[in-house]
Design a protein with these regions (language model features):
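C-terminal low-complexity, charged extensions that often adopt amphipathic alpha-helices
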Residues: 141-149, 153-173
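An acidic-aromatic
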Residues: 96-149
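C-terminal motif of bacterial Sec signal peptides marking the signal peptidase cleavage site
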Residues: 16-19
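Edge/loop elements at the starts and ends of beta-strands within beta-rich repeat scaffolds
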Residues: 60-68, 78-83, 90-92, 113, ...
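Bacterial N-terminal signal peptides that target proteins for export
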Residues: 1-9
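Gly/Pro-enriched, hydrophobic low-complexity segments
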Residues: 22, 26, 167-279
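N-terminal leader/targeting segments and the immediate start of mature chains
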Residues: 21-81
């Protein structure tokens, strides 16, 4: 409100000048279009300033700890089929994201999904099989420009800087946060080539409540990854979402494919008691 009042006299003066210029144009043809353009530029600068300020608030919510360990339930939905098993989530910043799927009651490991900066690992303990591949070899990740650091930002409830480990001050200026609507959610957007990133952010707390990544290509069709966050608990003096749901869909190859995963976690800890890489 203070910013609006600060610019009100300027806007009023420009309106008056523009009005006088219109009358003068009738008599001698003189026009002063620059006055309107100055008003527009002032409005654009103020909108950009408010957008950057809000993006900085989002970044200030980042959990500062290096490790997050938690247990809970993992639910996978493929079409009409749904399965829920106990699970563990272990994350070490810039090194590893690991989801372990456990056998009910016995809690022995059934499968493991692991992301590191260099590879993706899918380990099936039950059938004694595994797939280990680089990000360029996993078509959905490669086609959508998703790297380890993109996935890390999503799991850690943070903004994504495409192709970078962290978001710099210069990167923050590329985001557009539109708080003009005055609603409880502020939409944020970032475009990078064929990929559009969108976030839904709580206006009061600046916590990210949802993220949507869409990739459009003539060669690979349209793919999307949608992430929602709920049930925020305190982790390292910051808020971390203990319920995360992410769904991905693609029509790559002319066929529609979709899946949805829900992670429900309890009491996240910041312990370092976990290996950073799985030996296979």
């Amino acid at each position: 409100m203070k910013h609006t009042l600060r610019y009100a006299p300027i806007a009023a003066a420009l309106l008056l000048i523009t009005s006088c210029a219109s009358k003068k144009a009738i008599t001698d043809g003189t026009q002063l279009p620059t006055q309107t353009s100055k008003t527009d530029k002032n409005a654009e600068k103020e909108a950009a300033r408010q957008s950057l300020q809000f993006v900085q608030r989002i970044a200030n919510n980042n959990v500062a700890t290096e490790n997050i360990l938690t247990s809970g339930d993992f639910t996978l939905q493929l079409g009409s089929k749904e399965i829920t098993v106990p699970a563990k989530l272990s994350m070490r910043k810039d090194e590893c994201i690991r989801i372990q799927l456990l056998m009910p009651i016995l809690r022995s490991e059934l499968a493991r999904i692991e992301f590191t900066p260099n590879y993706v690992l899918l380990l099936d303990r039950y059938h004694k099989e595994y797939i280990k591949a680089s990000y360029s070899e996993v078509s959905f990740l490669a086609n959508n420009g998703l790297s380890f650091y993109s996935l890390q930002a999503l799991f850690w409830n943070q903004l994504i800087a495409p192709g970078a480990k962290t978001i710099t001050d210069a990167d923050m200026k590329k985001f557009v946060a539109d708080g003009a609507a005055g609603s409880s959610r502020v939409p944020g957007t970032l475009k990078a080539g064929n990929i559009t990133y969108k976030w839904s952010v709580d206006a009061a707390t600046a916590l990210i409540k949802g993220a949507d990544i869409t990739f459009k290509s003539a060669a690979h069709g349209t793919s999307s990854l949608t992430w929602t966050y709920n049930d925020f608990n305190t982790v390292g003096q910051k808020k971390f979402p203990t319920t995360q749901q992410f769904g991905f869909s693609t029509n790559y190859g002319g066929s529609n494919h979709a899946a949805q995963v829900t992670l429900q976690m309890a009491s996240p800890k910041t312990s370092t008691n976990s290996d950073t890489k799985t030996e296979v």
